[in-house]
Each structure stands twice: as C-alpha cells, then as structure tokens.
Amino acid sequence: MDLIRKIEAQNKKSEAFVFNVGDTVRVIYKIIEGSNERLQSFEGIIISFQNKGIGKTFLVRKISSGIGVEKIFPVYSPIIEKVEVLRRGKVRRAKLYYMRNRIGKAAMKIKERLNIKKVKH
C-alpha cells in the first residue's frame, strides 16, 4: 500500500486546481488526432467529484442545442491544459445530479458565491 502511495505522489501534478462543485468552469484540454494536436474547450457546471486518489475525476455538464452534455475529466491528467473558473457557485450538495432533471434556464441556474474559500483538488 505504501508503494502505491509513493507512485501516486510522483505522478500528481504540482499545481492544484482551485474549484468546487457548483462552479462554472472552462476546461481547456488537448486532443491528439494522429500527428495533429489541438486545444479544445468545454464550458459548464461542475456537478460532482469522484475522489479516488490519483484517479480523481470531476463531471462537467453543459446544455448544447437544448441537449444536456456531460463530460468526465481526470484532475491529474496531462491532457488537461488548464481549468478556468468563470463563476463561483453557491450550493449545499456534494453531487448536483438533480440538475439533469431541469429544463431551460433552470438547468444552468446556480446562485453565485461571494465569499471564496480556497479548496485544493
């Protein structure tokens, strides 16, 4: 078990992203197609975290052409270039799966958090 923790510590990124559930973020990540490499962004609300050590992931949801799209990103992946926090959300739940049942403007509506606590992930 100690060997696993040592390997995880070596593979973690040094910089920690500072975001939380309910925040509206823009994730910029690399897409590799053959020999071509390009950057693409995905903007939405973080609706959950899965805490599994180095395999920690977060789920981002957005509405595209009236259809909900969700994407899972590993926090410590080398594919992720950066995560920009566009808006801090004020929520009282750890998982926002209830957002899946909302339609229209309510599907992306979360109150804004004014006092910011820094949470490292």
UniProtKB/Swiss-Prot annotation:
Xref: Gene3D superfamilies: 2.30.30.790
Transmembrane portions of the chain: none
Protein name: Large ribosomal subunit protein bL19
GO biological process: one example: translation
InterPro entries for this protein: Ribosomal_bL19, Ribosomal_bL19_CS, Ribosomal_bL19_sf, Translation_prot_SH3-like_sf
Domain of life: Bacteria
One annotated Gene Ontology cellular component of this protein: cytosolic large ribosomal subunit
Task of the protein: This protein is located at the 30S-50S ribosomal subunit interface and may play a role in the structure and function of the aminoacyl-tRNA binding site.
Entry keyword set: Ribonucleoprotein, Ribosomal protein
Family label: Belongs to the bacterial ribosomal protein bL19 family.
UniProt GO MF annotations: structural constituent of ribosome
